[in-house]
Amino acid sequence: MKEREEIDQLQRACNITKSGVERILKFIKPGVLEYEIEAELSHEFLKNGSRGFAYTPIIASGASACVLHYVENDQECKDGDVILMDVGAEYGNYASDLTRSVPVNGKFTQRQKDVYNSVLSVMKGAMGILRPGILIDEYHKEVGLMMQSELRSLGLVDQHDIDKQNPAMPAYKKYFMHGTSHHIGLDVHDYGHYHKPVQENNVFTVEPGIYIREEGLGIRLENDIVIHKDGFTDLMGSIPLLADEIEDAMN
């Protein structure tokens, strides 16, 4: 559980991250290098009172977005690709953790937008069920069912895949192979009891993703939220998230 003062520090870290995101959405274009985006973020974070990144940033364009912990950040961003950026500023020893996936040329293709909106739908659904009393394992199973439905709508899994799946390795895990949420605070992966029910004033990330290796497309979205008795506060709620908001900010 986080004290009010801790949540204030986390909000400040998220606000600095917002400044960085707003800067790079105007900067990204075909031909830029991933590490140039990293440099722009670093400058904006430091300018706003952060000591830098809260963790090693992931700036992954094209097929590299399907590598979950890609940290080379050394490739050219190409026209037509989507770039996945998992980044966050530190402030006062507290971490923020954000992921956005944006079109290098400022405009999603229809397929990219369809996948993006499926991830967004799961993200919003996950935020809606992460409440005091739920166990993280139960929560992730519910999120898995949401993801299964979205993958069916995208034509990535069908009923046959679902009927024959191993319960220990559901069909959706081919395209969404990581957890949905983790504690965040002094550490980006903060200490917390995952076998105990979620409590009020816990702070979690919410970060579903869909990774389609055969299409060279990986999309993840992530915000940090504070859990309340009857809802949540999205610490990153003012950062562009909808596909149209991303495109508008880039253009």
Which stretches of residues belong to each language-model region?
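Active-site neighborhoods and metal-handling regions in enzymes and metal-associated proteins
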Residues: 1-251
